[in-house]
UniProtKB/Swiss-Prot annotation:
It comes from Oryza sativa subsp. japonica. InterPro entries: ADH-like_C, ADH-like_N, ADH_Zn_CS, CAD-like, GroES-like_sf, NAD(P)-bd_dom_sf, PKS_ER. It holds the Pfam family ADH_zinc_N. This is Probable cinnamyl alcohol dehydrogenase 5. Zn(2+) 1 binds at C43, H65, E66, C159. Belongs to the zinc-containing alcohol dehydrogenase family. Homodimer.
Length: 354
């Protein structure tokens, strides 16, 4: 089959302004799945990428790696999916399939990983993301949606969800007897709270915004709330947490936060501050604490979507039309969203382009 034309929304330069673009999707390979995109979440990474804040953008750039839709075609070797299946695609669309990382289901660490957008595909072309009408993906990187999982509220789990689920699983912060802190209550943080409660853990939200206390406790189900700028509250929480999932992308003092951990406690970074972080060695060494990082998750971690469906874990979203996407980006830059924008691709992309 010949390549297929698809509708997309692309940034042409570092202004980040998104406008219609007709893109080409590769012909369907024997191992490929073709997906009609119905929803795509807006991740903060999309904003960084379209504005070239990470200095690696290739324009035109079509962002989006929180994709949900339905299968319209499957290659002859595909065994897991058929037409009509509800599916999603996260941050990756392919890898080498043969390295140690791939063999362990850790494709996110494959030296040859191909990301969903702004990455070089195996044919040398640049990948385009989910702000588009359809996508062609190797079946290994397609996630089946359980019937109980709505596509719009489930789409953000393919990035935000896996980003917090994977380190909680890997670092043992998924045990009912443990106490986890969630630093930051945004797109990542609110999902981390929900997963931690699904694991049966005690959850404390740590935030610089006192106004989020009621939201955290009453709407999201956190057990406690600590204002990071309140010395009394921070002192009261000192040494109480087994781990902290740090979702904040701002540059903040790390030593007071490490003080909240018990001896042998772990802080896992999933947010990416623009500037280097100052690490206080004594705060780690004295109580045998660990500071670690985590980058999304491998395909083995997509069991996350089944656990989410079982426990009713979904993202809190604001569904928008494709013609609102630039306004949404402006609002996202100001943290003016509770908690994730999701573009209604299926119903609005065509109208926005025409």
């Amino acid at each position: 089959m010949a390549p297929t034309a698809a509708a997309g929304l692309a940034a042409r330069d570092a202004s980040g302004h998104l406008s219609p673009l007709t893109i080409s999707r590769r012909s369907t390979g024997d191992d490929d799945v073709v997906i009609k995109i119905l929803y795509c979440g807006i991740c903060h990474s999309d904003l960084h990428s379209i504005k070239n804040e990470w200095k690696n953008a290739t324009y035109p750039l079509v962002p989006g790696h929180e994709i949900a839709g339905v299968v319209t075609e499957a290659g002859k070797n595909v065994t897991k999916f058929k037409g009509g299946d509800k599916v999603g695609v996260g941050c990756m669309v392919n890898s080498c399939h043969s390295c140690d990382s791939c063999n362990q289901g850790l494709e996110n660490h494959c030296p040859g990983v191909i990301f969903t957008y702004n990455s070089v595909d195996k044919d040398g072309t640049v990948t385009y993301g989910g702000y588009s009408s359809m996508v062609v993906v190797h079946e290994r990187f397609v996630v089946r949606f359980p019937e109980a999982m709505p596509l719009d509220k489930g789409a953000p789990l393919l990035c935000a969800g896996i980003t917090v689920y994977s380190p909680m699983k890997y670092h043992g912060l998924n045990v009912p007897s443990k106490h986890v802190g969630v630093l930051g209550l945004g797109g990542l943080g609110h999902v981390a709270v929900k997963f931690a409660k699904a694991f049966g853990m005690t959850v404390t939200v740590i935030s610089s915004s006192p106004g989020k206390r009621q939201e955290a406790l009453e709407r999201l189900g956190a057990d406690a709330f600590v204002v990071s700028k309140n010395a009394d509250e921070m002192n009261a929480a000192t040494g109480t947490m087994d781990g902290i999932i740090n979702t904040v992308s701002a540059n903040i003092p790390i030593a007071p936060l490490l003080g909240l951990l018990k001896p042998n406690g772990k802080m896992i970074l999933v947010g990416l501050p623009e500037k280097p972080m100052e690490i206080p060695p004594f705060a780690l060494v004295a109580s045998n604490k660990t500071l670690a990082g985590s980058c999304i998750g491998g395909m083995a971690d997509t069991e996350m979507i089944d656990l989410a469906a079982k426990h009713g874990v979904t993202a809190e979203i604001e569904v928008i039309g494709a013609d609102y996407v630039n306004t949404a980006m402006e609002r996202l830059a100001k943290a003016d969203v509770r908690y994730r924008f999701v573009i209604d691709i299926g119903n609005t992309l065509k109208d926005a382009i025409e």
